[in-house]
Amino acid sequence: MNPKNLSLSLIFILMFGAYAANADFYGRAPEVLPGTIAEMYTTAFWIAKMKAPDQVILSSSAILAMNDSYRSRMKADPFKDADKDRIPNQSDLNRWPGRYIVLPDLASMTPVQVSAAVKEEVGKDINFMRGKYSKNVIGLKSVEFKEFGNMLAIRYTDWELDRFEKEMAADTIGGSVTPLDAVTVCDARLRIVPTFTPEQVGLMENGKARWDVWNVNVVRIGSPVSVLHHSRSGGYVFVLSPEGYGWIKTEELAFGSKAEISKLSRPASFVVCTGDRVPYYSDETCTYAGGWFRLGDRLPLVSKSNPRLVAIPFRKADGKLSSEKAWLAKDADVSVGWLPYTRRNVITLAFKMMGNPYDWSMAWYGRNHETTVRDLFACFGFELPFNAELFTFFSNNNKRVVRPDEGKAEQYKAILANEPFLTIYTCGGGHCSLFIGENNGEPIVMDTNGYGYDKDGIRYEIRRWTLTDTSQPEYFLKTNFTFCELK
């Protein structure tokens, strides 16, 4: 053999061998996880355990009143006289920039004050991107938000970060800012960094945790937002949304009057998406999808007599808002009006998401532990807060704090004292799960689990919405936890 060809062959073998050695996927945890049994993975198993599966627990008006009550309490002194171990950890609440406990009232602020707020919030985004915002991540203590990499897990250079910062255009924010009214025309990602192309994500490590942490959340279709600033290219706008401050692609919203927006965001007659993701179509044949909406999203009905015909917010070429008609399939997974709040409906919705992957930052339009239960209960009208550590203050009817030093028996007793299907519990760092029952005296929950376990020398990753016992996450019984009873 030609020595040159031999050398090339050896190089190829070495390169391929090195690749193959690192090409294994992470082991998927089995469908039936430790601590559970196969029968549990059906809705029938849990419905059979319910005393009154079709009893309406709360009316829609009572649920909306709970939302109003929570917002009112948060505007006052929300944590006054609360157990110190029940009060949320500020580091968890502010893990990402742009969050707030109470929606800022821009109407009560002067243009100069709005400008100061915008400069501060955009500054937080810049600091976050440059690793100056957060020192560490609760639950991932070995990982710090100090530097980021792209989709190939290659660290960003200074000039790349400079380009992103230039796009944020902080230098163009004037001394006074007048908010513009707009509405999202699709489910829109709320970004910390206004990136240009799909590979420009914010990975925090080259490992299993390949989440894009340059994302805050997904803002629902038809959500009113206040536009406060635009990026240098005009490709993004900086907004105040129901999910926080952040950057939304300009093409994903439309400008309109408050009255026009209200008709779409607060409709009197509407359908709620009760499927994981439901398309809408351009005509009655439902051949070509025109878009989609997600669990808990609402769309106005064009006519009460036709539950298939909905109005969707549409961005015209000039950026202004228009309302267009769209069709739902005959078997579309939706509810006309709020879904009745029954135990059967809770577990049915929960099982529709079974197996969905864990998306910590919602950058893939997925869900994490908090947003899974938020979207689930949104179908009934609940507007749960952005962070699970605030859930206990939403219902405010269970102020119990369970501590590790009480021991496993007391911890189990405290969990099992709550009503299944209607109770969310939250443990250290804001991790939450939906309590659904017990197996041999041990609590069983549904959880979008970002963790895994070792067995016989093999690592199994869960990282999906599924059933589990209290062994996941492994720190659950080692931290304080609280409850949110939605009844």
Task: Give the role of each language-model region.
Residues 346, 360-391, 429:
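Active-site nucleophilic cysteine motif
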Residues 212, 332-337, 355-364:
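Second-shell loop/turn segments in exported
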Residues 24-191, 197-202, 207-210, 240-275, ...:
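Boundary regions of SH3-family modules and the immediately adjacent low-complexity/disordered segments
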Residues 207-231, 286-305:
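Conserved beta-strand/loop element in small beta-rich adapter and peptidoglycan-binding domains
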Residues 35, 41-45, 49, 62-69, ...:
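Low-complexity, Gly/Ser/Thr/Pro-rich intrinsically disordered linker/tail segments
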